[in-house]
């Protein structure tokens, strides 16, 4: 038995939960952050029906369940369900006893303070962890890309945020957060598919639309041009087979859905697109650091995985930036999990070991210690 106990790293996204051991290069467990409850009463006695299902099991039985995501826009809205997800992570996915390992969790920037305190409380009181730390997601993504300076555009399922970081410090006054991400794009795709005559209504059918989005959507370099191309020929059309064997065809919906990232007004949101948000964030930073930020725009999270997104981002930011400025978009291939990878790197650093909040410190100070130790 080695003397070092591996820390557990859990990146609780609004859509997927990524969990594993510090020092690994990829998460061991990746499963949907879903808790499902049966819609109907069981009639077969002795089937051992559960009153709730978590993750992949909820996903596979979705036809008879009502699916709920306990994390909305990066903030935990249902703590009972969240506890179920953590319980599932420790005991079923990682098969570890949480009282034996330090636990690193992640959160979105500009989250309510109470959210962090409650997280801390549950980890120490329900799961009896020996040590705990909570880190900001975008900062971890930057670690994973091997940089200490850059601006991270982190867009997942529930929240998108832009965080400028200089020499390892997030610049809090310039952090921008947009409550528009993958889930909103899925909803928007549901809506525009309905206009084509394909209706998806239940929580289970929404998962089908999410799959269509992940497999077929892309970002157009020139939106107007692409709309014309789609109208004139069927070259952009793709077909998708539904679980029951029916085949549907989708055309301009393929790029109209992700276009909402650049034109949130189609979702009825007032915020600027991700390119404008990134540019504004850079402009809020000191004039001396801007050059380094323009040259290190790091993509992170599942919603940045669309083909064509980096090129479009490059084009849009270059148009906004001063003409002589060198703009560089960094899109690491493993960016879907870069937050987790950054957490794995951080938790295994020898210099990090004195940063943990210990159970003893927690017992002395209570949950508010998280604001003093984690920033």
UniProtKB/Swiss-Prot annotation:
Its EC number is 3.6.4.-. GO terms for cellular component: actin cytoskeleton; cytoplasm. It holds the Pfam family Actin. The keyword Acyltransferase does not apply. Disulfide bonds: none annotated. It is an enzyme of class 3 (hydrolase). It catalyses: ATP + H2O = ADP + phosphate + H(+). One of its GO terms (molecular function) is hydrolase activity. InterPro entries: Actin, Actin/actin-like_CS, Actin_CS, ATPase_NBD. It is found in: Cytoplasm, Cytoskeleton. Belongs to the actin family. Actins are highly conserved proteins that are involved in various types of cell motility and are ubiquitously expressed in all eukaryotic cells. This is Actin. It comes from Neurospora crassa (strain ATCC 24698 / 74-OR23-1A / CBS 708.71 / DSM 1257 / FGSC 987). The lineage of its organism: Eukaryota, Fungi, Dikarya, Ascomycota, Pezizomycotina. The gene is act.
């Amino acid at each position: 038995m080695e003397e070092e106990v591996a820390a557990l790293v859990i990146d609780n996204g609004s859509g997927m939960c990524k969990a594993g051991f510090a020092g690994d290069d990829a998460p061991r467990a990746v499963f949907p952050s879903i808790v499902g409850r049966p819609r109907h009463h069981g009639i077969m006695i002795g089937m051992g029906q559960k009153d709730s299902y978590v993750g992949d099991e909820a996903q596979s039985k979705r036809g008879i369940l009502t699916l709920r995501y306990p994390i909305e826009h990066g903030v935990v809205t249902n703590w009972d369900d969240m506890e179920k997800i953590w319980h599932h992570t420790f005991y079923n996915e990682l098969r570890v006893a949480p009282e034996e390992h330090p636990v690193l969790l992640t959160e979105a920037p500009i989250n309510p303070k109470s959210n962090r305190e409650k997280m801390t409380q549950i980890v120490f009181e329900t799961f009896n962890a020996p040590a705990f730390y909570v880190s900001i997601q975008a900062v971890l993504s930057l670690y994973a890309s091997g940089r200490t300076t850059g601006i991270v555009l982190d867009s997942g399922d529930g929240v998108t945020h832009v965080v400028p970081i200089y020499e390892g410090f997030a610049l809090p006054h310039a952090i921008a957060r947009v409550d528009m991400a993958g889930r909103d794009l899925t909803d928007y795709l549901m809506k525009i598919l309905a206009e084509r005559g394909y209706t998806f209504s239940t929580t289970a059918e929404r998962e089908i639309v999410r799959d269509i989005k992940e497999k077929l959507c892309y970002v157009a370099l020139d939106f107007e041009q692409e709309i014309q191309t789609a109208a004139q020929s069927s070259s952009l059309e793709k077909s998708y087979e539904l679980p029951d064997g029916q085949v549907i065809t989708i055309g301009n919906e393929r790029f109209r859905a992700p276009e909402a990232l650049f034109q949130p007004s189609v979702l009825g949101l007032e915020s600027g697109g991700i390119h404008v948000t990134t540019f504004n964030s850079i402009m809020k930073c000191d004039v001396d650091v801007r050059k380094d930020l323009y040259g290190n725009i790091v993509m992170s999270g599942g919603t940045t995985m669309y083909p064509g997104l980096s090129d479009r981002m490059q084009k849009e930011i270059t148009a906004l930036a001063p003409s002589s400025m060198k703009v560089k978009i960094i899109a690491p291939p493993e960016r879907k999990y870069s937050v987790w990878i950054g957490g794995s790197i951080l938790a295994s650093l020898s210099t990090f070991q004195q940063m943990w909040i210990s159970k003893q410190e927690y017992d002395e100070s209570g949950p508010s210690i998280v604001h003093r130790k984690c920033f």
